[in-house]
């Protein structure tokens, strides 16, 4: 199944009026991952805990040295492997396709013949832009969750939206303040609107990405409450990966949630899913931030370490034991 970022649908438009190299990349930017063509491209193997990521570049010039780009890929892959306890797919693939412009322009992840991600990469991208990029980690997080079908797409995209900044924070690439700032800004977009029928039945952009992320934040908090903060969502996801779950596998949603719950010895994922799948499940975010001890003034986040859930908040971005 194809996984798209909101910006990824724009990637084909970059081909219009491009050079011969860009035109030759048509087949590499289609609706499916070019598994066969990928094998014909020069590639580099990046070894990561639990496997390796094979990285190939489509034809086209890039201003940054490939060694710099590969170091960015390596950092991103290590952040994801650290979060899941290992690389979710031991033989994952990454295709980098140059286009005009700057920055990482979009990403797509597939599981048809193994976990594979494609990144659309501006030729004039700077090293600073790579340092601040979130898209590659978002795509690689998708590798660690089974394909559960279009009705449950919010479980897939919500997971990548929630886990990406936390994985980067645990790897030392992002501050805890930035993680919570983005959640405070983003989660209101995932709240139910008039006519909402629950996450399984309201496939809007806000509900798929940020409604899904809210589900996982609530699950993370509840798992930690049930286990006296010894375990969290991260342990549930590691259990799914340890059981063979990845984007290259089709699993019923019931199996995914039950496997995750087994990893925390709770029923939080299954119970929360039943609560939110077919009903709006509105959440008082202002009260949630108060309990977590998170407040934002302008663009700056501060923490109240005496808040009821401050210890849980700290544990979410700390390296898992």
Predicted feature locations:
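Acidic/His/Gly-enriched intrinsically disordered linker/tail segments
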Residues: 151-220, 225-227, 233, 242-247
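Soluble non-cytosolic domains of exported or imported proteins
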Residues: 63-75, 126-131, 135, 150, ...
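Sec/Tat signal peptide C-region and signal peptidase I cleavage site
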Residues: 18-21
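Positively charged n-region of N-terminal signal peptides that target proteins for export
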Residues: 1-4
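Beta/coil-rich, acidic/histidine-enriched accessory regions frequently appended to metallopeptidases
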Residues: 246-321
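Bacterial N-terminal signal peptides
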Residues: 7-16
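Structured beta-strand-rich cores of soluble
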Residues: 23-47, 75
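Juxtacatalytic substrate-recognition/specificity segment
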Residues: 45-148, 152
């Amino acid at each position: 199944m194809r996984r798209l970022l909101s910006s990824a649908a724009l990637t084909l438009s970059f081909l219009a009026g491009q050079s011969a190299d860009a035109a030759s990349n048509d087949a590499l930017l289609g609706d499916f991952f070019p598994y066969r063509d990928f094998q014909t491209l020069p590639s580099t193997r990046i070894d990561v805990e639990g496997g390796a990521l094979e990285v190939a570049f489509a034809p086209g010039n890039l201003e940054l040295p490939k060694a710099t780009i590969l170091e960015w890929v390596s950092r991103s892959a290590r952040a994801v492997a650290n979060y899941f306890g290992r690389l979710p797919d031991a033989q994952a693939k990454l295709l980098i396709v140059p286009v005009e412009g700057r920055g990482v322009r979009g990403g797509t992840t597939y599981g048809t013949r193994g976990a594979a991600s494609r990144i659309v990469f501006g030729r004039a991208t700077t090293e600073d832009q790579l340092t601040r990029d979130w898209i590659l980690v978002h795509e690689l997080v998708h590798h660690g969750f089974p394909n559960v079908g279009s009705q449950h797409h919010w479980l897939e995209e919500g997971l990548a939206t929630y886990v990406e900044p936390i994985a980067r924070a645990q790897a030392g690439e992002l501050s805890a303040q930035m993680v919570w700032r983005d959640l405070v800004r983003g989660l209101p977009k995932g709240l139910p609107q008039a006519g909402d029928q629950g996450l399984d039945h309201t496939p809007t952009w806000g509900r798929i990405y940020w409604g899904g992320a809210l589900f996982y934040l609530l699950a993370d908090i509840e798992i930690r409450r049930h286990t006296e903060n010894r375990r969290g969502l991260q342990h549930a996801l590691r259990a799914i990966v340890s059981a063979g779950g990845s984007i290259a596998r089709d699993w019923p949603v019931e199996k995914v949630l039950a496997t995750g719950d087994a990893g925390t010895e709770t029923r939080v994922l299954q119970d929360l899913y039943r609560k939110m799948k077919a009903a709006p499940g509105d959440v008082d975010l202002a009260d949630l931030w108060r309990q977590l001890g998170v407040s934002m003034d302008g663009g700056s986040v501060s923490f109240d370490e005496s808040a009821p859930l401050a210890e849980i908040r700290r544990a979410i971005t700390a390296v898992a034991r």
